[in-house]
Every structure is written in C-alpha cells, then in structure tokens.
Amino acid sequence: MRLRLLALFCLAFAACLPARAEDTEPIKVGVLKFGTVNWVMDTIQTNGFDKAEGIELDVVPLASTQGTTVGLQAGSLDIVVTDWLLVSRERTSGAAFTMVPFSTALGAIMVPPDSPIKTLADLKGKTLGVAGGPLDKSWLLIVAYALRTANIDLRTETTQEFGAPPLLAARAKQGKIDAVLNYWPYAARLEAVGFTQLIGLEDVVRELGAKGEVAMLGYAFNAAWAEQNPSAIDGFVRAAEKANELLATSDAEWERLKPVMSANDPNFDEATFDALRRRFREGIPERRLTFEEADAKVLFQFLRELGGTKLVGPGTELAPGTFWHGTTQ
C-alpha cells in the first residue's frame, strides 16, 4: 500500500513539474529582423511562457516579408506574421494557410508640425508618401474612405511617392513630402517628433463598415501542420496571450525590452519609446474571432473593388477558413 501511494505521489508530482527541454515541441517562427513581433517573441522566451506551454520557440529573423511567406509555403517555417488578405489569397489558390489575430494597430497619414493640411481635401495637389506600393491595402482603404467622405480621389488628385517605410519617414522629416501614409510603428516615431495624425486607419475601417478595431495582421500557419500538432499551436496561442497580458500591464517589462526596441534606430528616445508602447498596447486584440472575421469580410470587398485580382486573387469573398477556429472546426 505504501509503495502504491508513493508511486501515485511521484506521478502527481511529476505532472506538476514544468516540461523538460526534451519534452517541448519546437516551433519555428519567422520574423522580420526589426519587426514588432520580436517584442512578443522576446517576452515569451524571456519569461518562459513557451516552456510552460510545452513548446520551444525557434525565432528565425528574415530580411523581408517575402521571405516569411516563402518560408511558410516551403514548410521551413511553422508560423509567420502576415495579413488576412494574403492568407485568403493563398487559400483561394489551394494552400491551407490560416491565422489567429496578432495586432489591431494600423497605420495613419501623418503631417508635419504646423502643416496647413487639416483635412483629406487639403491633400489635393500635394505629394503624399505611401508605404508599400500602389496595391498596399492601407493605401486602397484610405482611397475608398476619401472617395466616400471627402469626394477626393487621392490616386489622381495627389502625387504619390511609394517607398519603404523608414525612407518615407525620413523624407517626411526632411520636408521633402507633404504628408505620409505609413505603418503604425513609423507613424508612432513621427508622432514622437511632433507630427500629427491626419487620419488613422482605425477610423477609416469603421467608416467603411467595420464594427470595431480590426486585426489586419495575424500569426499565420498551415492548417495541416496545426491539425497534426494541436498541442503546439494551442500552446503557442496561449503563450502569445500571456505575453500580451504582461505587455499590457507591466511597464517594467517594457523597460526590459528597450534594447530590442531601439535596435537599428539611432534616433530612439523616451518620446519614441512612449509612443511605441502606447500604440502597441492599443493594438492588442480583444474581440471575439467571429467579429474579426465579419469585419474582414466587409473590408475584403473594398479591397477587391480597388485592387482587383492582383491584390485579392481570384476569390470573390474572404476565403472560408482564413481565421483559425481550432482543431475542431
């Protein structure tokens, strides 16, 4: 009897112990070298959230978004961050990509201090920097919004300068362009040096029919991989949620992240730090997945109308399964 009780005690005690390294499931996560997802991955690893969930992250830094997509397609990466538009397009073409929300933080049109530009109509005849290219989703949503609310076609009534986000941010600070539509980390950096927001994408998507803050970006992965490794994907999602909870509440954790945030940014200062932290926190997803999916379906139609098949692929609606509802779907 004593031996049996001792054996039961040992089994119960072992179940309470954290997973050993050899028991963890490895997950390769592809990230842009200086992207904001690094902050979440660093938080997960430093605080042991991955090990506590029985997984071990292998973070793979990459130079371009194309590299993350290629890695996922080739199976050399398990998870990458991308937008639901790409996931939907890939699914329409036969791939089994799917995703869970990463961030609702969106870009904005920023104007310099003391700029005479106060409304979208004031952009007429001006030079507008646009991060990405003519088919960038943020740009096309802004175009749709301007047509609806200000009766201005930004494609024909402004001069666009397309380019990389850091280059356009620098040109805006140098006064070489009148305004810039940039991704949120660069918009936050401009805010830190006195630029103001003319219009944010959060307001744009609401005007176009979204019911809340939309997570355009998500953690994308292959559904077949998730079905074969349910504990791995579930553990990753829980670890990411724990990281977000910590980043939403702990200023000390952000202080620890400063070296990661300031990498490759010679102008990083306290104002930049505060702006990035605030905008990241505002972008932590909080809505139910069904709401995210419903809003994505609405926005998809605007993007299809303005970007055509070059942007959205051959599909006429958001591909079913774009958002991951778990292994029981």
Q: Could you tell me what each predicted segment is?
A:
Residues 52, 202-212, 282-293:
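Short, solvent-exposed loop/beta-turn-alpha elements that line the ligand-binding surface or hinge
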Residues 22-155, 159-162, 174, 178-184, ...:
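Short, glycine-/small- and polar/acidic-enriched structural segments
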Residues 297-329:
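Conserved C-terminal helix/tail region of periplasmic/extracytoplasmic solute-binding proteins
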Residues 7-15:
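Bacterial N-terminal signal peptides
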Residues 226-307:
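Secondary-structure end/capping motifs
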Residues 1-7:
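Bacterial N-terminal signal peptides that target proteins for export
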Residues 17-21:
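Sec/Tat signal peptide C-region and signal peptidase I cleavage site
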